[in-house]
């Protein structure tokens, strides 16, 4: 009985944190930096913490495709809260994480190959660097 109650509370907590991350990612502005002056008005709807989270995950991580992480968090939270079977959700989460990685690296490769603009804004810095590694490793230029 106590374990069921803890899983419900944990599910609600995961949903709340995931919604916070989701709004942080949706309010991401590439022109905002966490190290800007305290006098500058922050436009992220979740404040300075949302700015830091979106900066780390979107700009320094795998880009805009990271919006799927809070979606998976909401699904996991609801599954724990409703005490449903999570066998299929494990497989969906694994495929989702693989999709995030591959899509970000593919976008990075596309921006490196076909664009003259900055190639880390949409795929993220990590996705772009991994794509750049593969371009250098597999090319003969």
Task: Please identify what each model-predicted range represents.
Residues 1-141:
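Alpha-helical transmembrane segments used as membrane anchors
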């Amino acid at each position: 009985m106590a374990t069921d109650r803890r899983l419900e509370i944990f599910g609600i907590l995961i949903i709340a944190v995931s919604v916070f991350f989701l709004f942080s990612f949706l309010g991401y502005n590439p022109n905002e930096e966490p190290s800007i002056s305290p006098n500058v008005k922050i436009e992220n709807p979740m404040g300075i913490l949302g700015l830091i989270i979106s900066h780390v995950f979107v700009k320094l991580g795998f880009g805009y495709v990271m919006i799927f992480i809070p979606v998976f968090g909401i699904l996991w939270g609801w599954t724990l809260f409703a005490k449903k079977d999570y066998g299929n959700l494990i497989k969906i989460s694994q495929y989702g994480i693989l999709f995030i990685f591959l899509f970000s690296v593919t976008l990075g490769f596309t921006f490196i190959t076909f664009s003259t603009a900055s190639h880390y804004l949409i795929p993220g810095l990590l996705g772009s660097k991994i794509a750049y590694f593969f371009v250098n490793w597999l090319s003969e230029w």
